[in-house]
Amino acid sequence: QQRTATVQELCEALDASESTIRRDLNELDRMGKVNKVHGGATLPDSQFLADEPTMAAKEALAVAQKKCIAKAAAALITAEDFVFLDAGSTTLALVRELNGPALDARYVTNGVAHARTLAQKGCKVFLLGGLLRPETEAIIGAAALYSLQQYNFTKAFLGANGVALDAGFTTPDPEEAAVKATAVRRAKEAWFLVDDSKFARVYPAVITELHGGAILTNRCPNPKYKQYTLVKETEE
């Protein structure tokens, strides 16, 4: 598969004028479908993946970055908040960083480790019922979705295995994606906690498009993401 094409090649292949091709390339570049280069365009270098590390393996990755993101996320929570936390490793790091007024907020989670840690901190926590997925220790399935639909959240904090301009926020498992997507819809504010290694990665199950949630990251490697959603960086 050819990943790079010149304007002239596209004109000949599509039997279109140069002005039409350039206009279309501008629009595709804005959408994140291609990257404009001098005289043509290339396909974005999004990496398609499908593997799912265990929760223990995830916790060992990008530890310093996750801690910075977690601290910034914890600072967004007030005592009056009603918060959803999904079963990601970065959201678990967030739970460990909770202090002060954030301890008086109320929490709903589908993460077993999250619920246990919240309870140990003295927080009021509701654990969703449903099917336990061993790989991520997440509660999923119809019962979890039904429970989620009974709540309205002031804030939701979620993880994603990948975030890409052309694919939005994605994850390997469709059932986990369904829980995350439902939480996004039920929240006034939805924050995706993703370290810089997650950018330009695409997984099989879509959570939401890029404009569906704000991004809290240690570093955003591509300024184009800021054209579609709010991006907060801890390394600014």
Give the role of each language-model region:
Residues K66-A74, T91-L92, L145, A177:
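Short, well-ordered alpha-helical scaffold segments within catalytic/effector domains
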Residues V83, S89-L92:
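Gly/Ser/Thr-rich loops at beta-strand to alpha-helix junctions
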Residues Q1-Q8, A13, S19-F84, R96, ...:
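HTH-adjacent hinge/linker in prokaryotic transcriptional regulators
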Residues T4-L10, D15-S17, R30, K36, ...:
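Conserved phosphate- and dinucleotide-binding cores of soluble alpha/beta proteins
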Residues L61, Q65, D86, R106, ...:
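Short, well-structured alpha-helical patches and their helix-loop capping segments
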